[in-house]
Amino acid sequence: MRTTIDVAGRLVIPKRIRERLGLRGNDQVEITERDGRIEIEPAPTGVELVREGSVLVARPERPLPPLTDEIVRETLDRTRR
């Protein structure tokens, strides 16, 4: 997918990708330069530990996108390379 960097160095992530990754305005991303390439990925979501009865439960600090079969397959494919 092709996009343009403006004169201020800003880059628009296409809507389809933002929606699939659950990214919204003001969300943070991690940018890495590796082997002459730019990698952009969602910044890790912080969690809050909440006690539910005798169990500690990790709750994300912001809503996360639903985990779909497609996301699981893509993640497995990426990690197996």
From Swiss-Prot:
UniProtKB keywords: DNA-binding, Toxin-antitoxin system
A GO MF label: DNA binding
Ranges of residues in domain SpoVT-AbrB: 1-45
Cross-referenced Gene3D superfamilies: 2.10.260.10
One family name in Pfam for this protein: MazE_antitoxin
Superkingdom of origin: Bacteria
Family matches, as PROSITE patterns: SPOVT_ABRB (PS51740)
Function: Antitoxin component of a type II toxin-antitoxin (TA) system. Its cognate toxin is VapC40.
Assembly, per entry: Physically interacts with cognate toxin VapC40.
Protein family membership: Belongs to the VapB family.
Protein name: Antitoxin VapB40
Organism: Mycobacterium tuberculosis (strain CDC 1551 / Oshkosh)
